[in-house]
Amino acid sequence: MTETRTTCPYCGVGCGVIASRAPHGQVSVRGDEQHPANFGRLCVKGAALGETVGLEGRMLFPEVDGERATWPQALAAAGSRLREIIDRHGPQAVAFYASGQLLTEDYYAANKLMKGFIGAANIDTNSRLCMSSAVTGYKRALGADVVPCSYEDVENSDLVVLVGSNAAWAHPVLYQRLAQAKRDNPQMRVVVIDPRRTATCDIADRHLALAPGSDGGLFVGLLNAIAASGAISDDFNDAQRALTIAQDWDLDKVAQFCGLPRQQIADFYREFIAAPRAITLYTMGINQSASGSDKCNAIINVHLACGKYGRPGCGPFSLTGQPNAMGGREVGGLATMLAAHMNFEPDDLRRLARFWGSERLAQTPGLTGVELFAAIGRGEVKAVWIMGTNPVVSLPDSHAVSEALARCPLVIISDVVADTDTGRFAHIRFPALAWGEKSGTVTNSERRISRQRAFMPPPGEARADWWIVARVAEALGFGSAFAWQHPHEVFSEHAALSGYENDGQRAFDIGGLADLSREAWDALEPVRWPVSRSEAAWSVHKGWHRDGKLRMVPVAPQPTRATTDAFYPLILNSGRIRDQWHTMTRTGAVPRLMQHINEPVVEVAPADAQRYHLLEGELARVRSPKGVMVAKVTIGDGQRPGSLFVPMHWNNQFARQGRVNNLLAAVTDPHSGQPESKQTAVAIATWLPAWKGELFSRQPVPLPASLHWRRRAAQGIIHLSLAGDTRSRDWLVEWCQRQGWQMQVAEGGKVWNLLAWRAGELMLGWWSDASEPAIDADWIHAAFRVPPQNAARRHALLSGRKGGVEMPRGRIICSCFSVGERAIGEAIAGGCRTPGALGGKLKCGTNCGSCIPELKALLAAKLAQA
């Protein structure tokens, strides 16, 4: 058994993990008790990492035009085709689209090639979709992209405000640290500002369920209240302009704008002003807005104005969504940045040209994410290299992105997964290393750099992203500038650039790490930057503007760009769920992570369910002017009337019409370019199909285009849930006949079941009824492993249920131990009255703790019924 200290590849908390690999290859993961981000804690996704390292579905060799190729062939094809486009159309016709999943070394290589040697700044990243407004907010206020807070500040604050953040699900380990800090300090107060009542509200002393998109008005009103209280410092540039705008935002105006009772707002304002220490945690609910940058600055303004900044337990804390979004920001992996916190200014341009030894350096900012794919659609960008991300799923207006890629003359992808919604458009495909195989560094939300270490050999012909970029650079004729042989060399160059001609003028500086030996780099302990060679003082109090001052940015709150009408009367919000990550290429392969929420759902308030005749558990079509999706209805009091919520994760690999981004328009913030993903006007209507069914098969089945399907996680077989309006199953019978399989059919009323066999081996099973068929999926899975050996058992299998089978477990609440609602309900009825008692009896909530808010909700509901 070998053990390797590394980091989790999911959210921006940046947890340390210890990966243990057995001689036969099995991997298990536990939290690293020495890592300062998590001190041994893990969420359910992190705890399941050992179940994601298999090679099923992996891209393991290069391809060119759909045919397997050698590495020399694929690299030569990429180099020659890129060179032809550059020579004919210029460097602006080329673009890279990268990912917060990349390691810093990979990011650095890509940024250097695009900006430094191809000569255009058209390199952007999926981080544009999650935190570019936060970057803009920090740069406008502080003069640099500096996150001025730490996790210890969260634990040591008197008042923690979470706005636009469901940290319990999206940043679960940081949430657990906050929950523990609140238990240790009962005087700590927690305020959650969110239109939805989420799991994060479990520890909230106050929940402000404001109108979607109205956060800016709430914080501008708070600035006015701070000024009125006299607790204000105006020693900042533009302070008077910001205060002048805020003066119009009295309690009545804020209450009307936010849809909140006046007293709730007044109480929150008094609490914030009175708290000796206050910290505000904000994330996608703030950033993903057409006015996200202004909302970020409204938050920063109140912290500056009342002195709750630059000291322990205080500050505006943007939580990043991805494991290395921060690393991408540090290297300059956004089209609006240059490199190492340098900008497109004459001194910085000359400095970077000297360091890189390049005469081709891009001189102006490039195309941001939404702009980039629009330019591809117009034919202006003729080559795009997509690295470690799935923009057909993650960008707004998915259909337009697909159409753009379909028309693009050259699409290159580097990825670990063979089949994605984006990958089907690729002309050249490079197999990249995945977590556990690649080695480098990442930076978490609190500026902490950690090593991500390899503990498995590269599979097939997969290679590191930095290596792929360097070899393509070589094919383009720039090999001498990319002659790295090890990721340590890339990191050293990146670190050296951060300290180059930097005597305290630039905030980002890790020049003190530039001379690490390979052994020292490999053993690098987690460290927060700066790590400078310079003796210049560094402080979050410092303003990084030329005058050295901080700024309060004047903010005029704007209503959401999405407006409802008679045709689209509801506002749609999209976001993360507890057990899935991004587009599910990793987490979707783990059966236990698919138990909690296993298909696209739409959360609806009870009043809206009644108004639009929606039924719990039934399917509904959600429409916008851009498209349509299908999801299962979930009715709950946590949803604000007039609003819907849909998870962002599902895509064409997991469901037909399951992509929420089909519905989103490409509306962006004018300052940051970040899309508005939280507010879209939609309509909803129940869809009652003629039948529903379950399909299990050993091999892919070609489904008619008219069928709606959702893929379930299953090991060794394919499991689909289906629904349709056409009752004919002739297509399935004919397909099974072509395979030469023997069939058993049971038909009666609206029930139609089929088993298909080959030499005694179960190949396919189909169960359908007017409503969801009552089957025992676990028993069916077992029948594929060990087929029933007599006619009676086969007949029972054809019914889908064995005799005496227990009632279904209900929806899984605890994914760690597969504990369902039924068992929890029985334990409550048997006398369990606390989450601790439930954990003692069933183990639920005793591992990662992510399910504890739901355990509390079930306890409250069951005890209220008693």
Curated annotation (Swiss-Prot):
> Gene Ontology cellular component?
membrane; oxidoreductase complex
Provide the cofactor list for this protein: [4Fe-4S] cluster; Mo-bis(molybdopterin guanine dinucleotide)
Describe how expression is induced or repressed: By nitrate or nitrite during nitrogen-limited growth.
Role according to the record? Nitrate reductase is a key enzyme involved in the first step of nitrate assimilation in plants, fungi and bacteria.
* Record EC number: 1.7.-.-
Binding-site residues for [4Fe-4S] cluster, renumbered to this chain: C8, C11, C15, C43
Name of the protein: Nitrate reductase
Which Gene Ontology terms describe the biological processes this protein takes part in?
A: cellular respiration; denitrification pathway; nitrate assimilation
Which pathway or pathways does this protein act in?
A: Nitrogen metabolism; nitrate reduction (denitrification); dinitrogen from nitrate: step 1/4
Task: Report if keyword Lyase is assigned.
Answer: no
Looking up PANTHER family in the UniProt record yields: NADPH-FE(3+) OXIDOREDUCTASE SUBUNIT ALPHA, RESPIRATORY NITRATE REDUCTASE
Write down how the cofactor binds this protein: Binds 1 [4Fe-4S] cluster.
Native organism = Klebsiella oxytoca
Could you list this entry's UniProt keywords, alphabetically sorted: 4Fe-4S, Iron, Iron-sulfur, Metal-binding, Molybdenum, Nitrate assimilation, Oxidoreductase
Record flagged with keyword 4Fe-4S: yes
The enzyme's first-digit EC class, named in words, is oxidoreductase
Domain of life of the native organism: Bacteria
Task: Indicate the family of this protein.
Answer: Belongs to the prokaryotic molybdopterin-containing oxidoreductase family. NasA/NapA/NarB subfamily.
Q: Gene for this protein? A: nasA
Question: Per the database record, which ranges form the 4Fe-4S Mo/W bis-MGD-type domain?
Answer: 1-57
